[in-house]
């Protein structure tokens, strides 16, 4: 007997339940007929530990319309209406970060399902201060490595604070995965110290004892692992840094942010001191940069790099320059007929950006930029808008961007980007270089709609005619050539196990099946070899179709086994 959940445990809800039940009987004939026509089917299966493959008892299996706890053998039985639904499986001690659930098409002749839960990974941090004082209320930030536009970056995972024992806990971690853990800078005292005064505090430390992320080591955890991390924070002097300049057009001082060379912001921003006519900050030894930025009709940006080495830093002058838009020319080479299935992914209002007119030409694509100069932080959008007053329907401009080197990712609403260059540089191979004032060579983009298709089957399939089952795999077509386009992907449901990738740019691909969407660092040769080892190579011609057969995903393994 399965322990079924009682949705109306509270006696106070009995009357409400009766009203709802009664209301369900008061319906007009067409509605009642539709209700009677809805068929309910049994959905059975088992929940297993992804590491040990042992059954998990008392796991919650929630099918939206019905929910139940698994028995001692990990088995469950739901009664769900026909059609698509989502089944979510949870259990304390197992990761809750396994996506949004299992998509199941409910119908007749359903097979028994096997759902896996990943044992929760955790990291316990223990902090010691060099002074021997209590290490309570020390703030830490954890970063997880993500692949943005095919390039690895450290993105913030969460923030943690030590307790009275100097301990912090990171729970429910995605595993297997790697994490970078860094403490925040902390200073003693408050207010404005007298000139020449040296403050003391604890500089940031990244596991296992590095001064900044660039020299830190990632801590890798596996499913179910309970890892430990030891930190020793050393009390050091913080020296005064004064930065002049950085004023707006109206003469008002601009806010100045200070970062280490990885791009990670310092805990304390520079403070404006009227009596000095400059901004002031206190920093430990290290390499930094300060930046100031204004967004709006008159955008401006300035940056200055500096180092602190056993003494105060004076005479820094941060100069800001106006930012300018970057010209973008978009050429569309569309054919009248497209057998490759160039799907329109967007249809609606103009995507030119805030303040644009609805009757202005639409660029038909979006751009995102991710910095090649910093290893920390998010990718940013790069709004395109039609050049105001231009009669050329293909003349656009990229909104003001700060100086630096950026990898470009393109998202075409129709067709695909076949080429993108800036000053003759192929942006699929090299980053976009934006100089002082946001200056860059014009960007030239060509969009085509003669993409091909990749069709195929995962595994040997199931008996012909079966159209029901669970989302069992993700298919990724990993480009074996430089591109700024998103990686073609598709979900494969149980049943006949077929898939179709539409609007695929011509070129060679490695087709792989996995349990979740792939994150790939194209600059990591070992990772590329690991991810593509179990796949099949195909070449897609313009407007052509390629068919492949991919081995089924091994449960709990995460990728195809070919």
PLM features per residue range, with description:
Residues 85-103, 180-216, 292-303, 401, ...:
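A short, solvent-exposed loop/turn motif at the edges and junctions
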Residues 65-79, 148-171, 262-278, 372-397, ...:
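Short, acidic Ser/Thr/Gly-rich low-complexity loop/linker segments typical of extracellular
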Residues 35-138, 145-149, 169-172:
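Periplasm-facing N-terminal accessory domains of Gram-negative outer-membrane beta-barrel systems
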Residues 54, 77-84, 169-180, 185-186, ...:
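Short Pro-Gly-centered beta-turn/loop motif in secreted/extracellular proteins
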Residues 15-29:
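Bacterial N-terminal signal peptides
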């Amino acid at each position: 007997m399965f322990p079924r959940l009682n949705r109306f445990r509270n006696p106070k809800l009995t009357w409400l339940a009766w009203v709802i039940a009664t209301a369900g009987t008061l319906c007009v004939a067409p509605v009642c007929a539709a209700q009677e026509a809805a068929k309910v089917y049994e959905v059975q299966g088992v929940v297993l530990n992804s590491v040990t493959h042992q059954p998990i008892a008392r796991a919650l299996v929630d099918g939206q319309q019905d929910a139940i706890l698994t028995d001692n053998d990990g088995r469950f039985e739901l009664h769900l209406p026909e059609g698509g639904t989502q089944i979510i499986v949870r259990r304390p001690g197992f990761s809750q970060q396994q996506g949004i659930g299992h998509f199941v098409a409910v119908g007749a002749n359903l097979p028994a399902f096997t759902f896996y839960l990943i044992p929760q990974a955790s990291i316990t941090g223990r902090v010691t201060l060099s002074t021997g004082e209590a290490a309570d209320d020390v703030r830490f930030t954890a970063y997880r490595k993500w692949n943005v536009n095919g390039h690895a970056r450290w993105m913030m995972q969460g923030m943690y604070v030590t307790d009275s024992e100097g301990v912090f806990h990171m729970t429910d971690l995605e595993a297997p995965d790697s994490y970078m853990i860094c403490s925040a800078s902390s200073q003693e005292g408050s207010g404005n110290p007298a000139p020449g005064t040296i403050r003391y505090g604890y500089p940031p430390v990244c596991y296992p004892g590095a001064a900044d992320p660039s020299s830190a080591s990632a801590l890798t955890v596996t499913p179910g692992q309970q890892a430990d991390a030891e930190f020793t924070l050393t009390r050091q002097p913080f020296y005064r840094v004064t930065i002049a300049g950085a004023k707006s057009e109206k003469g008002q001082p601009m806010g100045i942010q200070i970062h280490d060379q990885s791009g990670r912001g310092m805990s304390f921003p520079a403070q404006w001191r009227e009596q000095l006519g400059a901004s002031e900050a206190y920093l430990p030894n290290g390499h930094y940069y300060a930046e100031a930025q204004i967004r709006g009709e008159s955008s401006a940006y300035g940056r200055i790099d500096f180092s602190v080495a056993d003494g105060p830093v004076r005479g820094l002058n941060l100069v800001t320059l106006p930012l300018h838009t970057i010209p973008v020319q978009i050429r569309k080479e569309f054919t009248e007929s497209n057998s490759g299935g160039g799907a329109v992914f967007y249809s609606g209002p103009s995507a030119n950006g805030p303040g644009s007119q609805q009757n202005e030409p639409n660029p038909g694509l979006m751009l995102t930029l991710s910095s090649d100069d910093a290893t920390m932080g998010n990718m940013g959008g790069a709004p395109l808008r039609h050049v105001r007053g231009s009669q050329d329907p293909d003349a656009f401009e990229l909104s003001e961007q700060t100086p630096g080197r950026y990898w470009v990712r393109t998202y075409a609403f129709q067709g695909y980007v076949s080429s993108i260059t800036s000053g003759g540089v192929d942006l699929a191979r090299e980053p976009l270089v934006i100089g002082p004032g946001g200056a860059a060579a014009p960007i030239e983009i060509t969009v085509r709609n003669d993409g091909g298709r990749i069709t195929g089957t995962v595994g040997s399939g199931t008996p012909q005619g079966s159209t029901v089952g669970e989302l069992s795999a993700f298919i990724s077509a990993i480009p074996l050539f430089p591109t700024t386009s998103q990686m073609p992907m598709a979900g494969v449901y149980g049943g006949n196990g077929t898939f179709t990738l539409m609007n695929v740019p011509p070129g060679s691909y490695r087709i792989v099946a996995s349990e979740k969407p792939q994150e790939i660092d194209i600059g990591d040769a070992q990772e590329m070899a690991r991810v593509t080892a179990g796949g099949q190579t195909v070449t897609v011609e313009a407007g052509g179709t390629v068919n492949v057969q991919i081995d089924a995903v091994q449960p709990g393994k995460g990728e195809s086994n070919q």
